[in-house]
Amino acid sequence: MVRSILNKYNIKGGTFDQHFLIDIGYLDRIVVAAELSPQDTILEIGAGIGNLTERLARRAKKVIAVELDPALVSVLHDRFDKVENIEVIAGDALKVDFPEFDKVVSNLPYSISSEITFKLLRYKFKLGILMYQYEFAARMVSPPGRKDYSRLTVDTYYFADASILMKVPKGAFQPAPEVDSAVVKLVPRPSPFEVRDEAFFLEFVAAVFSQRRKKLRNSILNTNSMLKIPDIKEVVNQLPDDFVNKRAENLTPEELASVANMLFDLKSR
């Protein structure tokens, strides 16, 4: 079915970071993972030829399908203009203001994985079932101290619970990507720790992970162009040695939040 759609519209893929999921088994598993109900409005980013779109529409109240590629937008209109519960939005998902939605289910364009994930996490929704490159997914869920533990891990944990549901081999796509993929379940929730200022915390995490191999004392001093803390050396000297003598990659999100809160309080005096 999926291959026949690609052939019918002479779609090759490869532009706009396109890798079409053609394995029906994985498509069906994604739909099951989304736990759809007839009351759900679903956002799909990078709808492609609509192979996932049509499966979502069978179970959901409405599917909002966002697609950038004009050729694929034409395919979606041709296939679904007469389907009442599918709305096609032509545009860049990073720039489009999303309508209200309950769940997001997508085979995401890999080149915008970070930006689109953090854009999504600013919206209110119940559940996300999202396809990423496997290495990216591993970074989202890594425990502290592992090589995959990163700014992405901490930022994701601040906004949501994330877990890898399944690994998807590159052969399940056409054209096949260079690496395997993974389906990630995202469940937004209130942060499990308190921060004084969210914008400062996120900037602090970005700063210290830009020098993840350095001790926190040095990474803070070296990235003050981002943090903009007056009298930075004096401020850092007031931080507990237990924190500043460790690397960012060895601190839990809660510990990083504690340091960010102390810095914010000290800079605000």
Swiss-Prot record:
The UniProt entry, under InterPro entries, shows: KsgA/Erm, rRNA_Ade_diMease-like_C, rRNA_Ade_Mease_Trfase_CS, rRNA_Ade_methylase_Trfase_N, rRNA_adenine_dimethylase, SAM-dependent_MTases_sf
Q: What molecular function does GO assign, one term?
A: rRNA (adenine-N6,N6-)-dimethyltransferase activity
**Keywords of this entry:** Cytoplasm, Methyltransferase, RNA-binding, rRNA processing, S-adenosyl-L-methionine, Transferase
A single GO BP:
rRNA methylation
Which domain of life, per UniProt? Archaea
Mainly localized where? cytoplasm
Q: Name one GO cellular component term.
A: cytoplasm
Positions contributing to S-adenosyl-L-methionine binding = H19, L21, G46, E67, D92, N107
Q: Where in the cell is it found?
A: Cytoplasm
Entry EC number(s): 2.1.1.-
The record's listing under PANTHER family reads: DIMETHYLADENOSINE TRANSFERASE, DIMETHYLADENOSINE TRANSFERASE-RELATED
Tell me the function of this protein.
Answer: Specifically dimethylates two adjacent adenosines in the loop of a conserved hairpin near the 3'-end of 16S rRNA in the 30S particle. May play a critical role in biogenesis of 30S subunits.
What family is this protein classified in? Belongs to the class I-like SAM-binding methyltransferase superfamily. rRNA adenine N(6)-methyltransferase family. RsmA subfamily.
List the NCBIfam families hit by this protein, alphabetically.
Answer: ksgA
This chain belongs to which protein, by name? Probable ribosomal RNA small subunit methyltransferase A
Q: Which organism is it from?
A: Methanosarcina acetivorans (strain ATCC 35395 / DSM 2834 / JCM 12185 / C2A)
